[in-house]
């Protein structure tokens, strides 16, 4: 019995206690510019050399984090493809070390000058429901592969008799689907706090107009792993038949699955789309919860980083039937956000036109399968995945205003 307990303990604690912390000592961080074809050729070549290659891309720029032993090979490939290369960080471990110095557990009070592990984010959600029982309701959309709850928060104006107000349009926010994009859950919890504590009449109006369903970390296993073991981990933590871990949960939804910017190789560090649509329990259970919502008007996903506002569809340049409305409402959102710090997002436009083609994402599935009228993805600001923790409120205030812009724009066009 004791042996069985020990084996179970090892299995369920694998991510934290067996995997060695990856410090990325002497890893180089490069920015590449050039032709789209050249950038794509370089990426394919380097991925054939190293499936764990860390890369981020847009239409005419790529960024790569590279092991020191691959630098010579990389420079030869860059020369062959006639690309321009710029080194952003000579040793990325220093950035991670400084960031980790600002991550700490605060038991008494959750704040927005540090990044928190998923357990602390969940505790924030639980505490919020306890402090605001008349306004909030805990949502458990399901469980992750490793058994963590997929926790969300419902915020809705109560009637005077204490009953929830029904019939309002639903505003759904999804965040943290990609584990390494820490600023997304941080700004989402900041937004929750502002909805419930701000005395600004515009923010109170925003709160009262909708039935809110907000999920700060829809990939809790991946986020926990990124926080504790591998900073650049992006996927879930499911186990494939060949022993490799995880699938990209934003390539795993059942809309044109596996067609663009998706890998069929389970050991692909970033883009493995899973063995089939909704193979991941996180996407499967979340999709069931979303499907159960009546009167869903807005679906918003937060990612990082690019300062972009994206529209469906991600794998096609064809426009949805209310594309012009989406653009007009999105422009209002960008305008409102720019008032905070003078920073302006690019877009709005389809992901296929403004970023790159990608299939199997949540935004596209929600639009196609559920016919949700107003669907957006925000690629938050920054020049890397390392947004300074002391500047979380800066992004948070922009997000608050951008959500207000969406609401005002939609109301002006008669969506509610």
Identify the meaning behind each predicted range.
Residues 2, 11-416:
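M14 metallocarboxypeptidase catalytic domain recognition
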């Amino acid at each position: 019995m004791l042996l069985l307990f020990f084996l179970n303990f090892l299995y369920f604690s694998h991510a934290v206690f067996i995997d060695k912390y990856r410090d990325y000592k002497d890893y180089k961080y490069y920015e590449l510019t050039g032709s789209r074809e050249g950038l794509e050729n370089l990426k394919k070549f380097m991925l054939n050399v190293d499936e764990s290659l860390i890369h981020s891309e847009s239409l005419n720029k790529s960024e790569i984090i590279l092991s020191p032993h691959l630098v010579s090979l990389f420079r030869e490939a860059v020369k062959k493809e006639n690309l321009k290369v710029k080194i952003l960080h000579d040793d990325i471990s220093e950035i991670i070390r400084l960031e980790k110095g600002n991550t700490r557990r605060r038991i008494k009070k959750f704040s927005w000058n540090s990044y928190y592990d998923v357990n602390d984010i969940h505790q924030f959600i639980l505490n919020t429901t306890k402090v605001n029982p008349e306004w909030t309701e805990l949502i458990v959309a399901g469980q992750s592969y490793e058994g963590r709850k997929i926790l969300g928060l419902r915020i809705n104006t109560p009637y005077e008799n204490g009953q929830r107000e029904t019939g309002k349009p639903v505003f759904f926010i999804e965040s943290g689907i990609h584990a390494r994009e820490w600023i997304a859950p941080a700004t989402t919890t900041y937004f929750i706090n502002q909805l419930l504590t701000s005395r600004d009449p515009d923010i109170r109006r925003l709160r009262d107009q909708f039935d809110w369903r907000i999920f700060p970390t829809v990939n809790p296993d991946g986020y926990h792993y990124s926080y504790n073991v591998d900073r650049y981990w992006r996927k879930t933590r499911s186990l494939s038949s060949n022993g490799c871990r995880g699938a990209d949960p934003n390539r795993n939804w059942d809309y044109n699955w596996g067609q663009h910017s998706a890998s069929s190789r389970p050991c692909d560090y970033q883009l493995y789309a899973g063995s089939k649509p909704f193979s991941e329990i996180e996407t499967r259970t979340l999709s069931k919860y979303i499907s159960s919502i009546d009167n869903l008007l807005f679906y918003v996903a937060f990612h990082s980083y690019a300062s972009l506002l994206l529209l469906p569809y991600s794998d096609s340049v064809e426009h949805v039937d209310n594309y012009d409305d989406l653009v007009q409402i999105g422009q209002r959102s960008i305008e409102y956000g720019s008032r905070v710090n003078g920073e302006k997002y690019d877009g709005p436009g389809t992901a296929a036109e403004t970023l790159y083609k990608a299939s199997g994402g949540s935004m596209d599935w929600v639009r196609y399968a559920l016919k949700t009228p107003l669907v957006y993805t925000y690629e938050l600001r920054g020049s890397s995945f390392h947004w300074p923790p002391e500047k979380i409120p800066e992004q948070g205030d922009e997000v608050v205003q951008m959500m207000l812009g969406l609401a005002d724009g939609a109301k002006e066009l008669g969506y509610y």
